[in-house]
Amino acid sequence: LTRRYFDATVAGDLGEPRTIRNAVCMHEEDYGVLWKHSDMFAGSHETRRQRRLVISFFTTIGNYDYGFYWYLYLDGTIQLEAKATGITFTSAYAGDYATEVAPGLGAPYHQHLFSARLDMCVDGIRNAVDEVEARRLPVSAENPYGNVFRQSRVRLSTESGAARLADNGRARAWHIVNLESRNRFGHNVAYALYPEGQPVLLADESSSIHRRAAFATKHLWVTRYDPEQRYPAGDLVNQHPGGAGLPAWTAADRSIDGEDIVLWHTFGLTHFPRPEDWPVMPVDYAGFTLKPVGFFDRNPTLDVPPSASGHCHGGVDGPYEPPRVR
C-alpha cells in the first residue's frame, strides 16, 4: 500500500499563512466486489475487484474531530464521506433535551450540517439540473396490475426554484446534465447527485442560527458560478444578522439552464447522543454520492482484469505453508 501526503497552507488565527505538514493523505485501497456474475447454464463465474482512490484529511473544531474522505471509484462514482468523532459537548443533565451519558452529565441533542460547494463541469461548463424521482401510477388500462411506476423529470431552470429538499420516499436525485454532449442513445450525458436525505436544520425560523445558517434549510441550492461566492453563509457569519450567502445570491433568480453552475448540497447528521458516545465518540458517518448517468455508453469497467486466484491463510505461528509432496 502506497500513501502520499501533501502539505496544506491555511489562514492562521491572525490571518497569516500557516502550513500544516502532511495535512492531506492520498492512497488507493481495495473495496470489495466491483461486479460479479455466475452463469448456471454455462458454468462460468466472473468477478472483478473494486478499487478506490482515497483523498482525506481530518480537522479538529472545538470538541469535535471531522474527517473528510473523497472516494474515486473505477466505475466513475465519486463519493464524499464525512466522519464525526471526538468528544460530545456536555452540560448538566437536562432530561428533555439531552442524553445522560454519565451520572448527572448530559449531551444535548444537536446537528452536524455541512455544505458541499460543487463547481460542476459535466463534460463542459454548460450544465443544467433536472430533479428526477419515482412517480407512482394508479391502476388503469395501461397499468392493469398496478405494478409499474414512472420516472419523473423536471428541469430546475432558475436559482430560486432550485432550492430543494430531498425526498427518500420518491428516490429523489438531481441530475447535472450537459446540454451539448450526448451519448450513443441520443441522451444528454449526466452525473447524478444522490443525497442521503437526512433532516435539514431543525432550529425554529425565529432563531439566530436559522437566520445565519439559512443554507442549511435546504438540501440543494444552485447558483450561477461566481468566484466571489465561496461560503454558503457569507463571509462574516458571526457578525451578520442573517440572510447572507445563498439566500442573498439566489434572490436575483438568474437562469441556471445551460449555464456555468454551482451546486450547494447540505448534508449531515442529527445526533441524539448515546451512552456509548462517551467519553469519546466512535465515528459516525454522513455524505453523498455522485454517479455517472449516461455519461458512459456502457459499464466502463469491462476492461478491469481479473484478480490472481489465491487464498489467504494465517495464524499465530505465521503464514500458512502447504504440505510438501514427498
What does each model-identified segment do?
Residues 1-77, 83, 90-96, 101-326:
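Extended effector regions of multi-domain proteins
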